[in-house]
Amino acid sequence: MNKCFRCQPRISLFQFSLPRCYAAVQPGCPPPQEKPVVGLPHKPDPKTVKCDYIGPPDAQSNLRPYVRHYGDEETRLARSLRLKRIEVEAWNTDFWTKHNKRFYEEKEDFIRLHKESGTSEVSADQMSHFYKAFLDKNWRIHIMYNISWYLKNFDILTLAAAVQLQRLLALAKRRS
């Protein structure tokens, strides 16, 4: 069931005191509830869905996969836009899959080395040093990713504008 945020009642947090629950288990907080996974067990066929399908997050990249709907009346320009979006999404998923794999491997190595040195648990302060070192080591990769991401999205925007212009011209032609 689709819910629109505008249709939801607005509740001010100042109206009543709500208990706060944090990531760590706090006394007096209810245990976290396991929510069932909602969605389809496999990707639907793009020709059978009525609109774009956004799936659950991918386990490796943490990105939500898209299935782009298209019909038989898709123009060449609309097809090139859809294929460009699919190409950029595949590139993005590939980047974040490799990045997250590298991050988790280095994080495990960091924790393992600290445990081998005699520390039973790694503190949040020690982990913050790892996070900063990881970001410092990969800043060039992140800059290049951002530049590539902006360029690819600019290409998508120009194609989307051309598709919309084509639709407007076709609509004007039908009305005249």
Curated annotation (Swiss-Prot):
Residues 1-23 form a transit peptide. Pfam families: COA8. It comes from the Eukaryota. Disruption phenotype: (Microbial infection) After infection with E.chaffeensis, results in reduced bacterial replication rate and increased survival. One of its GO terms (cellular component) is matrix side of mitochondrial inner membrane. Keywords: Membrane, Mitochondrion, Mitochondrion inner membrane, Transit peptide. It is found in: Mitochondrion inner membrane. It is a peripheral membrane protein. GO terms for biological process: intrinsic apoptotic signaling pathway. May be required for cytochrome c complex (COX) assembly and function, COX being the terminal component of the mitochondrial respiratory chain. (Microbial infection) Required for optimal replication of E.chaffeensis. Belongs to the COA8 family. This is COA8 family protein CG14806, mitochondrial. The lineage of its organism: Eukaryota, Metazoa, Ecdysozoa, Arthropoda, Hexapoda.
